[in-house]
Amino acid sequence: MEEVIWEQYTVTLQKDSKRGFGIAVSGGRDNPHFENGETSIVISDVLPGGPADGLLQENDRVVMVNGTPMEDVLHSFAVQQLRKSGKIAAIVVKRPRKVQVAPLQGSPPLSHDDRGFEVIEEFDGRSFRSGYSERSRHSSHDMLSHSWEGNRERGRPHQRTQSRERERSRGRSLERGLDQEDYGRSRERSRGRSLERGLDRDFVSRDHSRGRSIDRDYDRDYERSYHEAYEPDYGGGYSPSYDRRAHPETRYERSRSREHLRSRSPSPESRSRHEHKGQHDPDRPIGVLLTKSKANEEYGLRLGSQIFIKEMTRTGLATKDGNLHEGDIILKINGTVTENMSLTDARKLIEKSRGKLQLVVLRDSKQTLINIPALNDSDSEVEDISEIESNRSFSPEERRQQYSDQDYHSSTEKLKERPSSREETSGRLSRMGATPTPFKSTGDITAAGVTEASREPRYQEEGPVPQPRTAPRVFLRPSPEDEAIYGPNTKMVRFKKGDSVGLRLAGGNDVGIFVAGIQEGTSAEQEGLQEGDQILKVNTQDFRGLVREDAVLYLLEIPKGETVTILAQSRADVYRDILACGRGDSFFIRSHFECEKETPQSLAFTRGEVFRVVDTLYDGKLGHWLAVRIGNELEKGLIPNKSRAEQMASVQNAQRENAGDRADFWRMRGQRSSGGVKKNLRKSREDLAAAVSVSTKFPAYEKVLLREAGFKRPVVLFGPIADIAMERLATELPDLFQTAKTEPKDAGSEKSSGVVRLNTVRQIIEQDKHALLDVTPKAVDLLNYTQWFPIVIFFNPDSRQGVKTIRQRLSPTSNKSSRKLFDQANKLKKTCSHLFTATINVNSANDGWFGSLKDSIQQQQNEAVWVSEGKMEGMDDDAEDRMSYLTAMGADYLSCDSRLISDFEDTDGEGGAYTDNELEEPAEEPLVSSITRSSEPVQHEENIRKSSPEPRAQMRRAASRDQLRDASPPPAFKPEPPKARSQNREDSFDYSKSNLPATAGSEIPGGSTKGYPPPIAAKPAFGRPILKPSTPVPMPESEEVGESTEEQEDAPRSVLGRVKIFEKMDHKAKLQRMQELQEAQNARIEIAQKHPDIYAVPIKAPKPDAGLPPHMSSRPPEPQKAPSRLYQDTRGSYGSDPEEEEYRQQLAAHSKRGYYSQPSRYRDTEL
């Protein structure tokens, strides 16, 4: 005969970062089995090598996940519970097993194949098997009720043994194997798990702890047998537990497990023995001693346990309902079968009922379970009878005499714990999100190890505590204003603070702050504060919506001896719900600093990550918050609290500032002054700038909320094809996108590139369009700070060659360096990835990036945005006020130069477009340079690299004698006539850059037709501007420059002929430069007048021309000695004109003194 039994296991799985729990589930109410329609959640696959490999098997039925029943649930609900488990999941499963069942014989012992099943510890201490059996054709619900019906028909419950009754009183199952060799007491103390023991042959079987069933077995290699009534050789005798109380003739029958009672009938002999034993007085326990005579003998016991109602309070809902009675056996709790369930698991089920508790009970008319006589542990001399100390169960009468009904808060028997163990319980339960009340479940005795003797005195001590109902307390009446705000049932207490307030708090901003414990003897206790009171206000601080950490800190900061006024309301029902569900704090934050993992429980994170904080006082201690990472994978752990986060953020900000300090500036100056490194100068500057992360105005933790944006969010694109993408969006979708125009800065501004006013962005948004912005990462952070929430998309390139290929295909006329674009993209990805809202991978093989770009923008526009919960410092609610705040000096512009911001741009002379054109950009596009100090001479090598539009190979081919002759010092320094000499001294700076490229451009055929006008004319017009570098030069001047170029080409190739041309051009450049200097001076005066406390215009006295003035540059002036030698080498080709000879002598004398005769005139341009 074959029967299907169900073995139950509890498995704890550690989640793997890559494989998860390593299982797949199927089934559910919405996905029943295709053959039999079963709705159980079934393990459909176990990943080899995963966390569940060897622990779970296919076709296992999931009964419970972390205390949540999985019976008759949706498939999605089961999957969600597994995902919410975090790193650890406790899964209870039941596994079908077929066993051979043989009919029972009279006296011969049953064969091992016909008895039950074998319990093997397969899971390394992480699983247990309850061992209750069910027929495969019945569900667990039906089987439970049928099983009890079988017990009533066959087993006669009124004749069950006292031991069986005690099993049901505790609801715990212990499985022990008794073996001659295995004396080890390896027992598993985790809740809901079975314990197996191997005991010596002399080990005397004894049930110590009343209400705990002990399933003993002789060894793993032997099967369990049935009730002792089936075995005629199970002789009697007195157990050491009862030899002093029980009489040998009064013995009761040992009860059979419900499964065997259901499936088998006792033999005639056992029936007669059963009837014989039933004649004894059922009110007296009997003692039984079982002794092995052979090593392979078995005790033949298989015990079980059951939850029953031990006591009911007078004022509880169960008593008011009238359908429940003390002694009723609970079969189901909210649909979950309670057989072999621990009290701890039963308590969890009840706590998760959330106000609705559904029970299925079996009425015990004789109330056998609650009438068990009181017994004490025997003082037997048999060594190591049991390591389990009993937890005495009092009768209802005894319990009522020792403490009142108010000590109970639920049917799960939350008993007041001892003061010595309060701290331990507080630390254990505070992880649930609230500091616990001083209550503790009787729980698992094997895990807690609490002795019966230690519990009895505690009840007797707490018994005489006066009850608050006996003497009603009259509280102070709050003010009418407080009553109007907090309600009429508010009570007020007032006392002076001692060493501490004496309160332990629970809850948080999500549910309110509650009193979780009161220190005995404190003023708070004397004034009538009670556990479960909600604190609404302390002195002037409103506690509603306050996080628990802030509430504790506020109470701690109250000075000793100061009066404390507390407004509170008694809300015990809400308080119990808080403890049951573990709710407390709940708010969202966004990090603005980096944090590494400190402890195994900590979370590592970077800037821009969002967390949900669920406990601000983790483990009852300050310093850490318990948070859940919001993202693709929910992860729970510890993060620094607000104060520690601010300290860490300030340290990181200081390190960022030190990384870009003035030491790097002087290093750049050294590179600028040394020869042979000009080519890599800009690259070094960008490397230094990229190494410094973008600074931010945000605090370390920004409280955020998920909201929808009610406007078209601005769009910022980064990457090697950002300019092309912006142009396509504005051209192909003009109804949705508009490029924000750049404007020149005011005169005297420090930055060199164009800017975008926020007012321009707002105007585009008011037109219901996306504003396309070409701004820096720092400007993006400013947009986030001002709550414009830009959509920031980064184009991630695959390789440098891919960038070059795609740009040549999309923009053939562009000559931007692919190497620079690729390097800058990598730097942005490394330092500013927290600003990106989306990333699009750019592949040179296809052009699918544009469709992805449009889809990404539309998707992000429709999605909710994490917005700041409170307004930032200096920000107003109204948009107009916010804009007026942003239009203040220094905050109303967004830099349009798409390079990383650094301190070196202020004085770095190697400015230009944000990519290095490397002599490939046409001269028609003027180079936009950074601010340059006028006192710094421009070196000859720099002019060769930056001014000439021709490649290096062409430069070498154009190295003719005329070119060498033109490389001589600028003729603008001609001493005669004196007026020309005094004027030309000021603007020699402009011509030192333009002399050599002039001849080079005129030497190359077709240079002008290709868009390369001679730099002789171009440089005085827009070379090295100081105030408005991005403003183009008026066209009439360009025409004049073109005429001067033609005149220069027809002029004689003598020095005097060239001098006349240069003097004419120098005069025009001087006028323009003087006008710019005057505008700068006016702008500085205007700024200084508006902000006298910030700005001041330096007044410098002019120095006499006599003597050598000090140089303003960090390097000494470089006299043109090498060009002079070149001039002397070629002087033979000019003839022996005495005027030329005299000019050379005066020019040489001028060169010895340096470039500038009056450097003080330029010192006012230093910013």
UniProtKB/Swiss-Prot annotation:
Acidic residues bias: start-end ranges: 1037-1049
Residues of the SH3 domain: 584-649
Key word Membrane present: yes
Listed Gene3D superfamilies: 2.30.42.10, P-loop containing nucleotide triphosphate hydrolases, SH3 Domains
Membrane disposition: Peripheral membrane protein
Purpose of the protein: Plays a role in tight junctions and adherens junctions. Acts as a positive regulator of RANKL-induced osteoclast differentiation, potentially via mediating downstream transcriptional activity.
UniProt subunit comment: Homodimer. Interacts (via PDZ2 domain) with TJP1/ZO1 (via PDZ2 domain). Interacts with UBN1. Interacts with SCRIB. Interacts with OCLN. Interacts with SAFB in the nucleus. Interacts with USP53 (via the C-terminal region). Interacts with claudins, including CLDN1, CLDN2, CLDN3, CLDN5 and CLDN7. Interacts with CLDN18. Interacts (via N-terminus) with CTNNA1.
Record-given protein name: Tight junction protein 2
